[in-house]
């Protein structure tokens, strides 16, 4: 009944709840003699932590990570690496009204049916609070990728759509992504998104989002055919993130609007090396990397914790209504950007250790 771990060689297990004393993870399979301290992990956690802008939850968590094991004198020992972050800003009183009610769109009902008990405070184990530890594991994964692949591998996540408003790809600027609260590559979309989120928040609602992850520098040949395809493993990793309802590679779903002529990635030779004339398949063919940029996207549904009253039932199977109080993201997709990067990084690191 447990499924709190992911990965084969690079494997990590997360633990902890939203309003518990702490959250943490144990990362196994990390080779020895890799430089690693808290300073290597903290910058990635700072990207994800809550309370950084008016467009995310106002819960204040410093998310200061502590390494408990698996390193000695600033280097990995080859043994399990234990990480911990202490929760600091729980407000469990906000959830008293939903103790016996199921929030529509949340895991409240399904956890109750499966386990016969649930931590109603902030969603407990099903809360996105857990994703901080995924980001920590992702930071370690990046160190492994750097150690295993000679080329510089760059993993870049960006928010490309909120609600009905999508970026203009012609405006894509990697340098702008870390300079705004949305991780947007398009400067022109910011004001539109700000207005949309404010409108949704004032109406007691929320918005969904799409995040794109790009990986440059991967060699051709990474991944295994059929049941261990690198794209299927990435899809599994991304689908495991809270509120994610869809994943695609390359043109993905929009491929249905193409033909075999327009969607195929033709090839030539340049400087005695293979050259692809397009990248409609997102850098993966047959589950194996082509050496092109790997491109994947995932869809995050609108936050289910909203102020607007909704119909639901309670633990006595009686009909009732619910209005969720507390501090919640009006668009949870914003903080999902570094989480998506981390899950792609952990998948690539696992494949590097398995097949390189």
Language model: regions and residue ranges:
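Alpha-helical support elements that line or immediately flank enzyme active sites
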Residues: 21-33, 129-153, 228-236, 292-294, ...
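A short glycine/serine-rich beta->alpha loop
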Residues: 11-16, 119-130, 220-224, 279-284, ...
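Glycine-rich anion/phosphate-binding loop at the beta-strand->alpha-helix junction
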Residues: 18-21, 204-207, 211-319
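Short acidic, glycine/tyrosine-flanked loop/strand segments centered on an H-E-D-like triad
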Residues: 99-125, 310-330
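Glycine-rich, mobile lid/loop segments that gate access to catalytic sites or pores
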Residues: 113-226
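N-terminal, positively charged regions that mediate nucleic acid binding
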Residues: 1-59
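Internal helix-turn-beta structural module
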Residues: 11, 303-356
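Glycine-rich, N-terminal phosphate-binding loop and its surrounding beta-alpha-beta segment
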Residues: 45-104, 108
């Amino acid at each position: 009944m447990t499924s709190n771990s992911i990965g084969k060689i690079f494997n990590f297990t997360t633990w902890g709840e939203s309003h518990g004393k702490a959250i943490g993870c144990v990362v196994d399979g990390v080779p020895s003699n890799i430089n690693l301290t808290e300073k290597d992990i903290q910058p990635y956690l700072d990207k994800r932590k809550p309370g950084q802008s008016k467009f995310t939850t106002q819960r204040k968590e410093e998310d200061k990570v502590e390494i408990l094991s698996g390193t000695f004198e600033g280097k990995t020992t080859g043994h399990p690496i234990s990480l911990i972050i202490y929760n600091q800003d729980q407000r469990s009183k906000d959830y008293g009204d939903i103790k016996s009610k199921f929030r529509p769109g949340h895991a409240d009902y399904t956890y109750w049916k499966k386990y016969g008990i649930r931590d109603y405070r902030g969603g407990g184990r099903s809360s996105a609070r857990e994703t901080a530890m995924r980001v920590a594991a992702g930071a370690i994964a990046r160190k492994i990728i750097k150690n295993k692949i000679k080329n510089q591998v760059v993993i870049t996540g960006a928010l490309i759509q909120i609600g009905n408003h999508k970026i203009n790809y012609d405006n894509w600027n990697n340098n702008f992504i870390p300079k705004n609260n949305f991780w947007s590559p398009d400067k022109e979309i910011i004001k539109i998104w700000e207005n949309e989120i404010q409108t949704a928040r004032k109406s007691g609602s929320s918005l969904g989002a799409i995040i794109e992850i790009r990986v440059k520098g991967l060699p051709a040949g990474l991944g295994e055919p059929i049941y261990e395809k690198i794209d299927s493993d990435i899809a599994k990793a991304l689908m495991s993130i809270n509120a994610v309802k869809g994943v695609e590679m390359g043109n993905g779903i929009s491929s249905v609007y193409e033909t075999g002529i327009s969607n195929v990635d033709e090839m030539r030779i340049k400087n005695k090396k293979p050259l692809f004339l397009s990248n409609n398949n997102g850098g993966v063919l047959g589950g194996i990397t082509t050496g092109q940029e790997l491109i994947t996207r995932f869809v995050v549904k609108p936050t289910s914790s909203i102020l607007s009253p909704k119909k639901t039932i309670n633990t006595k199977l009686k009909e009732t209504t619910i209005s969720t109080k507390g501090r919640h993201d009006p668009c949870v997709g914003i903080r999902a950007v570094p989480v998506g990067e981390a899950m792609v990084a952990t998948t690539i690191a696992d494949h590097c250790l398995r097949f390189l």
